[in-house]
Each structure stands twice: as C-alpha cells, then as structure tokens.
Amino acid sequence: MTRYDEKKQLKCSFCGKSQEQVKRLVAGPGVYICDECIELCSEIIEEEFEDTKIDAEVSEIPKPKEIKEILDQYVVGQDAAKRSLSVAVYNHYKRINSDVKTTDIELQKSNIVMLGPTGSGKTFLAQTLAKILNVPFAIADATSLTEAGYVGEDVENILLRLIQAADYDIEKAEKGIIYIDEIDKIARKSENPSITRDVSGEGVQQALLKILEGTLASVPPQGGRKHPHQEFIQIDTTNILFICGGAFDGIDKIIQNRIGKKSLGFGAKIESSKDKDVGQLLKDILPQDLLKFGLIPEFVGRLPIVVTLQSLDKKALVQILTEPKNALVKQYQKLFEMDDVLLEIQDEALEHIAEKAIERNTGARGLRAILEEAMLGVMYDIPSMTNVEKCIIGKEVIAEHSEPELILNENRKSLKKAGAKRTRVKKESVS
C-alpha cells in the first residue's frame, strides 16, 4: 500500500522519507521508492555481481596434465600435439585471469597453427578443448573469406559466429576460442609479393592480422557486409584464442629441400625423402617454411605456436572406432539399443574399416561414411522387425556389402519366460 506521512505527503515505502526529503519518488503498483533507496539497491547488486565476476575470473584452470588426460579420453594418439595444445591453452587462460595491470610485464597472446593431414583430428581437438574449458567455440572456413569490398565473407563474420555461440554475451565471447579451418588455402600463390590483387589469399591474411593480434572490432549483428547506416556489436579480440588449422599439402617438400641443402660436402650424411615420412618431416618445421609456403611474415608472427599432427595408421583408426568416450562403435551400439537390438562389430570388420579409410586417404573423418555405407540396409530394416535380438557385422559386410548376421528370438515379446527359442539367420532369409 502507498504510505503517507501526517501531512498526507507521499513517502518512500522502504526508508519512510517524505517526498520533500528526497529528490525523486518512483511509483510502483501501490508502493513508492526514493532515489536514495534505488542507489543503495544498485550498490548492493553491483557488489554481489563483482564478487561473482571475481569468482568466475579466478576459477581454477585445469593444469596442462589434466587437460591432456581429458583429451586422451576423446582423442586417440597425437600425444605431442595434445601436450603442446594443453600447455598453450593453459598459458592463454592463465594470462587472461592474471592481474597484468599491476605489473610492468605485458603477457602477449600466443595463437596456434595446427598442421596435419585430412582426418588427423585438428578440428576435433579444438572442439574438445573448448568443451573442457567451457568457453564459447566457433568454426570458420578460411576459403569463404575475402578482403573487404569483394564478394564473399568479411573476416568480422567469424566473430559473429562466436558471439552467437555465446548467446550474444559479449564478455563471455571475448574469452572464447575460434578455429579457422583450411588456413593453408589462403596462402599467396608465390613467396614473392604479388603486384595483382589477391583478395582471397594475401588480402585475407592482411584482414585477419588485426583480429588475431587483438583489436576492438565492429561486427554487423546480422552478418554480411558492413554499411555506414547500421549498428555494430563491439567486441575486443585481445583475449580470444585463435587456432588455425590446415593440411598444408606440399610443405613437406619445402622442409625436405631446406634440410637437404644442409647435407652438402664430402662428409655430409645425405638423407633421401624416403628416409622420413611426412609426419616426421613436419616435426622439423620452421617459420621460414610457412613463409615459403605462402603465408605472409606478419601472419606467421601472430601464430607463434606451431603444432603438428601425424597421419593415423591402421591401429590408431581401430582405436578411434572403439576406445574414446564417444567412439563411433559405441554411438551405433546406442542407436541399435534404442530398438532393443544388440550390435556386435567383429575385430576383422573394424580392421577392414580402418584399411578402407587409409585407402581413401580420409583419415578418421571417413570412418563414419564407411560404416554408414555398410549398415544402411540393416538400419533401414531392423526398426520394422520385432524379433531381432542381435546384429553381427563381420568383415564380409564391410568388404563385400553382404548382409549382416541376425540372431532372432521367435518369442521376443515373452523373453522373460524360460526357453525362448533363438535362431541365427542371414538377413536375406528374414521377411
């Protein structure tokens, strides 16, 4: 109820001061609040908000060993890459949470470039890191970017994806991770600067420099091109971690040529290119090799941490199919389980899936496609069959696209009764 004093003047419902004693009274449904009480409430809320903000900032960052242990649960192999990424990410977020303003030492940002063949796990590693740290994550394709003023996407659209991933919470987005894929595709065509305009190569590298280093960027809220009569979202990229990935096809030859040039003279040990595989050569990469490949010096300078990934062999691909928490085989078993069917994929079948992926040169990325091809028929039929208890995938199902073996239970609806009759059949004999 509205409160009045003895002179029937309006009073604050909280502190009791009259209209004459305060600067302003704000009316609510049956109550009034004065400007002094509003200010006091504002201070209380701000103090509580600051406390929660400080708690969030100093929240414990996982140690490099802890980050790697979590990565091991999801990513098979690539131990050297996981160690490098764990240290780099730990140092990055330690830098954000540290009170650098109180010291004379400025901790600079260290972005990451990942080199590795297709399907070696570059994108998945970046996604898993963001999941571990619980920060917003966005993926961009470098091939769709062009220099400002040309047909294609502006580099600021990358930041819009991160803002959207953070539900438009700018403060949260400013501590996120952006993965730029196919970064090798924006290399300039030759090591020497071009006299012609390269809007999708060197031009994009130049456009990315500022946001990689750290700047206050203006992002169009609806994406697309900027124009002078629209509002922009302001975002500071200083604390955003950029991870750039690419296959860098052919860079192994650049490294080999550099190493080969040192092997001159009578006493020199000469190594042929066959002595080292691509993965081993990538371990010897230097910034000058990236320059030779076509990245400009300023761009390479903003990606000081170089992480290399190895090609996945047959053993690693089989492990990827079965061991991680979200392994493909476990995913398919879960799908079949939803139809009350057990799925068994035999070891010989798993090995043949890995061999096919190596033949296709698709790495881990191609494993799902191979499984889908082989199991499309049975996944189409089983939901309509009420008496299937188990599905067994052998090598011939993968190699020859033959039908899997099904174990039927003719009395499926009364399985709890003793002696339920079970039969083994090939899928062709099931109507």
Swiss-Prot record:
Q: List UniProt keywords, sorted A-Z.
A: ATP-binding, Chaperone, Metal-binding, Nucleotide-binding, Zinc
Q: Which domain of life is it from?
A: Bacteria
| PROSITE patterns from the UniProt entry | CLPX_ZB
Q: Which GO terms describe its biological process?
A: cell division; proteolysis involved in protein catabolic process
Q: Give a yes or no for keyword Nucleotide-binding in this entry.
A: yes
Question: Does Metal-binding appear among the keywords?
Answer: yes
- Which GO cellular component terms, listed alphabetically, does the Swiss-Prot or TrEMBL entry include? HslUV protease complex
Q: Which intervals hold domain ClpX-type ZB?
A: 1-53
- Listed binding positions for Zn(2+) are 12, 15, 34, 37
Q: Which GO molecular function annotations are given, in alphabetical order?
A: ATP binding; ATP hydrolysis activity; ATP-dependent protein folding chaperone; protein dimerization activity; unfolded protein binding; zinc ion binding
Q: Which residues bind ATP?
A: 117-124
Classification via InterPro entries: AAA+_ATPase (IPR003593), ATP-dep_Clp_protease_ClpX (IPR050052), ATPase_AAA_core (IPR003959), Clp_ATPase_C (IPR019489), Clp_protease_ATP-bd_su_ClpX (IPR004487), ClpX_bact (IPR046425), P-loop_NTPase (IPR027417), Znf_CppX_C4 (IPR010603)
Pfam families listed in its UniProt record? AAA_2, ClpB_D2-small, zf-C4_ClpX
UniProt family annotation: Belongs to the ClpX chaperone family.
What function does this protein fulfil?
A: ATP-dependent specificity component of the Clp protease. It directs the protease to specific substrates. Can perform chaperone functions in the absence of ClpP.
Subunit structure of this chain's protein: Component of the ClpX-ClpP complex. Forms a hexameric ring that, in the presence of ATP, binds to fourteen ClpP subunits assembled into a disk-like structure with a central cavity, resembling the structure of eukaryotic proteasomes.
Record's protein name: ATP-dependent Clp protease ATP-binding subunit ClpX
Q: Which gene encodes it?
A: clpX
